[in-house]
Amino acid sequence: MKKDENLLKDLWFIAISAAGGFILSLTGISIGWMIGTLIVACCLAMIRPAWLMMAPDQKGINRRWLALGQMILGIELGQKLNLSVLSVLKDHWFSVGVMLILSILLAMLSGYVLWRFSKTDMMTSFVGTAPGGLSAMPSIAQEVGANTAIVSLVQMMRVLLVVLSIPFLVILIYTKQDRTASAAAETISSATTDFRLAPVLWTVILILAAWGACKAAKFLKFPAPWLLGSMLGVAIVHVGGAAVTGHDMTAWWLSQANHVSQVFLGATIGSKMYKSMFAGVTRIIIVGFVSSVGLIAAMFLSAVIVSELTGISLITSVLAFAPGGIAEMATTSVTLHADSTFVVAVQVIRVILVIALLPPFYRLLHHLHGEKKDKKSSISGSSA
């Protein structure tokens, strides 16, 4: 009985929070559902109105919603690793490698700046500036013990700056190229909304692969196992299926699944926020804004250099380097006749690498930093 009551309360909280997501989605921003839901959920969690039926000591809604949101997101990300992406990686491995390494190094430099010049802790700073996507990084922040409120704020700021500035910037430098662009939907995901037997069966196989991989990732104590496990499980099965058949297997996958994932993630993360998380937020916003602008400027400069060295068009290079907004960058690349397959390939591979590799690295960095602090305190204690 109590379980049913808690489930209804959770659904009530998610439904109200999702209204904010729906309103912001009308702006056309691809992560509007996540941002709107997160903002409303955060406000509700801090105000706790009586009609919300949320106990004063309740620490947010059940974590199962976060796991479900992560799993849906992981399945979607895993499907993006298709033959087109692998073909780009094979043909342009040097250019892609340089872009990925520079992107991650510049993001880490941005995190270091945020850590040194604001009062936030090291883990929060690095996770907050990692270019792994607004949908993924706040949930990873929960897993690694970072401040989810600050991570969400910094990620939100960076993604909005990228989405609002990069497309206009490349339009200013746009010169028509005699190159045909792939369809954005085809580049972004091998999925269809047509309800046919073969795509539905393939979807069931992908979901089962995601579930099994999530359980394995949880057993192996991976960070964000529901996200990382489902993403890797689906990617392996998806690429394996394509290798056997010689073409990308098509799954039945509605675009609304992404919206549902964003709502679950935004509502869960927002529900666990409290006022003390925003201590010193003004300074963090200022430093975060400056570091995000610096990151975008550095990425743009790097894109110019890579374009000169490799012969990739400047517009393609800038859109591929942009630290966030996969859907927006893909759409812009198609509109401006840039190489949309290359743009999405670099963006997708970077997100997958960041989600898979950086959390363990941050944990190690955090551990080493903690040991260094302990050593310093023991030395100062013995000298006293």
Swiss-Prot record:
A biological process term (GO) from this entry: regulation of gene expression
Annotated GO CC locations: plasma membrane
InterPro entries assigned: AbrB_dup (IPR017516), AbrB_fam (IPR007820)
One Pfam entry name: AbrB
Record membrane topology: Multi-pass membrane protein
Location relative to the cell: Cell membrane
Keyword set, alphabetical order: Cell membrane, Membrane, Transmembrane, Transmembrane helix
Transmembrane segments: 11-31, 33-53, 66-86, 94-114, 153-173, 197-217, 224-244, 284-304, 309-329, 342-362
Main location group: membrane
Similarity comment: family membership: Belongs to the AbrB family.
Protein name: Uncharacterized protein YhjN
Organism: Bacillus subtilis (strain 168)
Lineage: Bacteria, Bacillati, Bacillota, Bacilli, Bacillales
